[in-house]
């Protein structure tokens, strides 16, 4: 895939659209309880990008931020509720984008399972991926 290529994405209702410039920094499944609850899923697949490679195309008045914990926030659409983004002090200069909100494919497949100590037993796991407990 072409480095510096831009790919688009957005929320379920289309009120918020964005573009991210490749390359991505990483891609991983997050099993933490907050991600599971924010998305109503067994885990969430995130792709990390440099923050200055994220461009909001439309919906700045629809994109809202929820402080999910000290030093972390989640971006969602105020119309449809889609959680699309995550930023944290722990990863300065990065914007994490929920892979399911990106239209098409990015430049890599998931490489790891993060916060694996919190995974749910009913979700099948790709055991070939690297595992991180936190």
State where each predicted segment sits:
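A short Gly-Trp-Pro
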Residues: 1-134
């Amino acid at each position: 895939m072409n480095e510096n290529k831009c790919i688009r994405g957005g929320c379920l209702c289309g009120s918020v659209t964005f573009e991210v410039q490749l390359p991505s920094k990483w891609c991983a499944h997050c099993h933490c309880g907050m991600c599971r609850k924010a998305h109503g899923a067994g885990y969430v697949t995130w792709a990390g990008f440099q923050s200055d490679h994220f461009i909001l195309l439309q919906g700045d008045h629809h994109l809202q931020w929820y402080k999910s914990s000290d030093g972390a926030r989640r971006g969602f659409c105020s119309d449809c509720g889609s959680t699309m983004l995550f930023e944290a002090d722990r990863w300065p200069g990065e914007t994490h984008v929920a892979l399911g909100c990106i239209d098409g494919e990015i430049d890599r497949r998931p490489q790891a399972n993060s916060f694996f100590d919190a995974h749910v037993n009913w979700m099948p796991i790709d055991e070939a991926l690297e595992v991180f407990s936190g």
